Amino acid sequence: MDPNTVSSFQVDCFLWHVRKQVADQELGDAPFLDRLRRDQKSLRGRGSTLGLNIETATRVGKQIVERILKEESDEALKMTMASAPASRYLTDMTIEEMSRDWFMLMPKQKVAGPLCIRMDQAIMDKNIILKANFSVIFDRLETLILLRAFTEAGAIVGEISPLPSLPGHTNEDVKNAIGVLIGGLEWNDNTVRVSKTLQRFAWRSSDENGRPPLTPK
């Protein structure tokens, strides 16, 4: 096993622990809490894949971080922060919309790279809107937190989410997954639109297959 993979997991476990303490003291905003929940699932998946205990990894991660901070000068820290590009967190969905359980009458699931696509094939002749919460950097989607498809009545009929066991995905991964979800929903004569935010940063009116641009809602 690559030692860098192990140390990265250990540090991620400790940093998640620190962020959890922040949340427990009610110092985190909605995007912060959102990422915290998603990252917890991701760490569990990575731990299972690597065969590593999260509690033990957290303790080792703490030692790694403490050693780095001990060697890090304040001036070097300032320079690192100044040179790091800042990402933005964009939200189409509320916390309630993201955390709501949903059920499928005719479930269909497909894995596309590091993303899982789920949809209800029983949905027909509906107007559907795609909404997503994600981070953006350099005017492009950086990390998808969750994408869901909603009917006009607010029912959830589809979803794209990162696989906890396969962390990391690209803008193209997300774009391809959106295409699969839209294609599946349109197969049953549903009309699918995307949010303006998603249209701008992730979908960008794809026309590789001769499709007309989707109209933002």
UniProtKB/Swiss-Prot annotation:
Output the Gene3D superfamilies linked to this UniProt entry: Influenza virus non-structural protein, effector domain, S15/NS1, RNA-binding
**Signal peptide segment:** none
Q: Nuclear export signal: where is this motif?
A: 137-146
Subunit composition? Homodimer. Interacts with host TRIM25 (via coiled coil); this interaction specifically inhibits TRIM25 multimerization and TRIM25-mediated RIGI CARD ubiquitination. Interacts with human EIF2AK2/PKR, CPSF4, IVNS1ABP and PABPN1.
> Does the keyword section mention RNA-binding?
yes
The question of whether Protease is a record keyword is answered with: no
Query: Where does this one sit in the cell?
Result: Host nucleus; Host cytoplasm
The GO terms describing molecular function are:
protein serine/threonine kinase inhibitor activity; RNA binding
Instruction: Show the segment(s) annotated as RNA-binding and homodimerization.
Output: 1-73
- Residues spanned by motif Nuclear localization signal: 34-38
Q: Which UniProt keywords apply?
A: Eukaryotic host gene expression shutoff by virus, Host cytoplasm, Host gene expression shutoff by virus, Host mRNA suppression by virus, Host nucleus, Host-virus interaction, Inhibition of host innate immune response by virus, Inhibition of host interferon signaling pathway by virus, Inhibition of host PKR by virus, Inhibition of host pre-mRNA processing by virus, Inhibition of host RIG-I by virus, Inhibition of host RLR pathway by virus, Interferon antiviral system evasion, RNA-binding, Ubl conjugation, Viral immunoevasion
Instruction: Tell me the domain comment.
Output: The dsRNA-binding region is required for suppression of RNA silencing.
Q: One biological-process term from Gene Ontology? A: symbiont-mediated suppression of host type I interferon-mediated signaling pathway
Known role: Inhibits post-transcriptional processing of cellular pre-mRNA, by binding and inhibiting two cellular proteins that are required for the 3'-end processing of cellular pre-mRNAs: the 30 kDa cleavage and polyadenylation specificity factor/CPSF4 and the poly(A)-binding protein 2/PABPN1. In turn, unprocessed 3' end pre-mRNAs accumulate in the host nucleus and are no longer exported to the cytoplasm. Cellular protein synthesis is thereby shut off very early after virus infection.
Q: Where is this region: CPSF4-binding?
A: 180-215
- Give the family per the record: Belongs to the influenza A viruses NS1 family.
Q: Name one GO cellular component term.
A: host cell nucleus
Q: Post-translational modification, briefly?
A: Upon interferon induction, ISGylated via host HERC5; this results in the impairment of NS1 interaction with RNA targets due to its inability to form homodimers and to interact with host EIF2AK2/PKR.
Q: Which InterPro entries match?
A: NS1 (IPR004208), NS1A (IPR000256), NS1A_effect_dom-like_sf (IPR038064), uS15_NS1_RNA-bd_sf (IPR009068)
Report what the protein is called: Non-structural protein 1
